[in-house]
UniProtKB/Swiss-Prot annotation:
Belongs to the ectoine synthase family. Keywords: Lyase. This is L-ectoine synthase. Pathway: Amine and polyamine biosynthesis; ectoine biosynthesis; L-ectoine from L-aspartate 4-semialdehyde: step 3/3. SUPFAM superfamilies: RmlC-like cupins. Its EC number is 4.2.1.108.
Length: 130
């Protein structure tokens, strides 16, 4: 059994920030459970293009509002507390935060914890498990 608090993660290498976002990596690949679980905050007024080419991501929005645009087909979705989206086709997408957005995110395969988005908006492929 693993029990962690966000207070324990704050200020550690599991506490990762980028331009306009902050992520607390609660469950990671080294936990050996087959997925990773993150609490991610997107700053109000920011726009991000992501393209998880090597991961499936499920996102549940717990606070804030914004817009999700599927850049593959142009579909636009309004997001608010209780909204969920699943990127099960590695869709390139744009996230626009009207207010600060807090999201709970699950990645498969799990991330290692230090990943940041590359120029295409992707995380690198997960390392092979030995």
């Amino acid at each position: 059994m693993i029990v962690r608090t966000t207070q324990q993660i704050t200020g550690t290498e599991r506490d990762v920030s980028g331009d306009g976002w902050h992520s607390k990596r609660i469950v990671l690949a080294d936990d050996g459970v087959g997925f990773s679980f993150h609490e991610t905050t997107i700053d109000a007024g920011t726009v991000h293009v992501f393209h998880y080419q090597h991961h499936i991501e499920a996102v549940w929005l717990t606070a804030g509002t914004g817009t999700l645009t599927n850049l593959e087909n142009g579909d636009v979705f309004t997001l608010g507390p209780g909204s969920m989206y699943l990127l099960d086709g590695n869709e390139r997408h744009q996230l626009s935060a009207d207010s600060e957005m807090r999201m709970m995110c699950v990645f498969n395969p799990p991330v290692t914890g230090r990943e940041v988005h590359d120029e295409s908006g992707a995380y690198p492929a997960a390392p092979a498990l030995s």
